[in-house]
């Protein structure tokens, strides 16, 4: 229609519309819808760009939730996927892993206590892990303590080494921030068999706070999958590409953890944020598979 109008500028719009069997009003309504659709796409892309300044690797499903929740933009998942794909904004997952566990240390280890436990509240099970960052030619390490029920990072520490005192600082942060209503209830502390978590000082701190000690029993990463998954999100969705100095790394990690805890919707939490679930203790429905068959049988009850 636009081409015909350009070729025949003296022919009235209603005459051209008559050639195709529709009215002048229908033509202008269609034109307006096309304009509004284009404007809506531009608004969506502008808002996605704004969101990704804080959540650089957020995918389509989570962007859909944040667009509706925080900006009132209600767009279908498939439509948003098409918009993102056409704009070249779809993300590829980063698949890199570096071993940070040394279990041949000869210190006492503990059995895995969480094989047949489905957490029913916050501060029931904490899982821990260490991830590394390459900054200005040096390896830096982030020690994380995560609440298994809510997926919230409750304690963390950035360090230039893997000594147990850094793991202790992360655990102390988690203990200080415990929800008051659960402080008198026991916490199961689950980790791999790394020397940091088996050290005398670390075990002493756990026992001081009446924590039950649980550790992985083999080399299968699925035995500590929640901790490794959260570490991967923090590292790959928020910290890479890592263009920061060593002196600025602490603040960068702080902002990343805040964005993850307080703003990023979580599929396994019915698209709530970890902080919301941790603070409210609301019931969530597990939407992920577990390594242990007992877990999976409970998930289908």
Features from the language model and the residues they span:
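Mobile-element integrase/transposase regions
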Residues: 73-77, 81-144, 168-173, 177-186, ...
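RNase H-like two-metal-ion nuclease catalytic core shared by retroviral integrases
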Residues: 101-103, 191-193, 199-204, 213-235, ...
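Basic, flexible linker segments flanking DNA-binding modules
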Residues: 17, 24-122, 220, 273-285
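Conserved, non-catalytic sequence blocks in retroelement Pol enzymes and Pol-derived host proteins
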Residues: 57, 71-72, 118-120, 135, ...
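C-terminal domain-tail junction helix/linker
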Residues: 200, 207-211, 233-301
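A short acidic/small-residue loop/turn micro-motif
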Residues: 147-148, 158-163
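Short, amphipathic alpha-helical "recognition" segments used to contact nucleic acids or chromatin
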Residues: 1-10, 45, 49-53
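Mobile genetic element proteins and their domesticated derivatives, centered on retroelements
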Residues: 16-17, 27, 48, 63, ...
